[in-house]
Regions:
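Extended amphipathic alpha-helical scaffolding segments in membrane-proximal extra-membrane regions
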Residues: 69-175
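Helix-boundary and N-terminal cytosolic regulatory elements
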Residues: 1-114, 145
Length: 175
């Protein structure tokens, strides 16, 4: 999928994009990543291995910036994660995602945001803000659990505190 930058992200075909050569967001999977990177004018010499992504990072290459994201699934914080690559050059953004996570984020941006992607910087801000948007809700839920535990401790109900605290600590470390 290709989304043309503008006040509204507009999905366009590859043929339309090749005629216009306008700045855009390319969304692809790892099977089509090399081809999509070439179309977008991005040179990346390393192998794309989504399964090996273990953390979030951004690094500068000669012609682009490359980022990897490893985001815990909020319903299973200790379990599986969303993994993807993001490539950014002077004009384009390429997202390599083997699941539907990025597609859902882009659809949410299109549905909720007034200024969706006039520039690649605005798009990147919206994209990252969108997957962080539920973090506050999750942290509030943890705060409530910890406050209940604090109340239990203040009433000398300390028998199970350690057993209740360790899973919370592990989950928070993964977020």
């Amino acid at each position: 999928m290709i989304y043309k930058f503008g006040e509204r992200l507009t999905e366009i075909s590859q043929e339309e994009w090749e005629k216009e050569k306008c700045p855009a967001v390319f969304l692809t999977d790892s099977n089509h990543a090399e081809e999509t990177l070439a179309i977008a004018g991005i040179v990346y010499e390393a192998e794309i291995q989504i399964a090996k992504i273990g953390f979030c990072k951004i690094e500068n290459q000669q012609e682009c910036m490359v980022g990897t994201f490893c985001i815990p699934k909020l319903l299973d914080v200790l379990g599986s994660r969303y993994r993807m690559y993001m490539f950014v050059n002077e004009n384009n953004v390429v997202i390599v995602d083997d699941e539907t996570f990025s597609e859902r984020l882009i659809n949410r941006i299109k549905r909720k945001r007034m200024h969706q992607g006039e520039t690649k910087e605005r798009f990147l801000y919206n994209y990252i803000a969108e997957f962080m948007s539920r973090d506050l809700e999750i942290l509030v839920a943890y705060e409530r659990r910890l406050l209940r535990m604090e109340e239990d401790v203040s009433q000398d109900h300390t028998d199970t505190i350690q057993n209740r605290l360790m899973p919370i600590r592990r989950e928070l470390l993964n977020l």
